[in-house]
Amino acid sequence: PWGFEIYSLLTRWNPLNIRSPLPKPASGRKVLVAGLGPAGFTLAHYLLNEGHAVVGIDGLKIEPLEAELSGVTPEGRRVPFQPVRDVRTLYEDLNDRVMAGFGGGAEYGITVRWNKNFLKVIRLLLERRANFALYGGVRFGGTLTVDDAMAMGFDHIALCMGAGKPTVLDIPNGLARGVRTASDF
């Protein structure tokens, strides 16, 4: 019991990291992470531990989680969350699971060999952090531009948007049967 909460603690406190076992104090810097696939959610984790405020956006609609679980209402207000006694209560049967929009290629691209229930775990680890906000349905370069982000006070923008359009190599058999591009997944 309480394995999720212990794991959550260890993402913020690492006694084996002698130089920086705890998250750093607030830096005052605000970072926009565009794209919440594996690169985006991993970068967000490290930026939070460096003391930065992080806003993650993704072009996909991200379904809200229950406020009792995430600590965030659908309107974005922070509320107390209930601790998770057994991580299995977070899991859904993968045959019945509906895509929630969070996770980029890990949500829609990685094969069934990877347990996509882990995306909810990753999302909760981020969303429960006070200096993290998450917005779906926001396309960087369309809905939100660089100028918009700078006007909103972001100090940095991290582009973690993955492979939206494949690069087709101009070589013989570049698209032969069996050759796949990132967007195929």
Identify what each model region corresponds to:
Residues 33-142, 147, 167-174:
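Beta1-alpha1 glycine-rich phosphate/pyrophosphate-binding loop at the start
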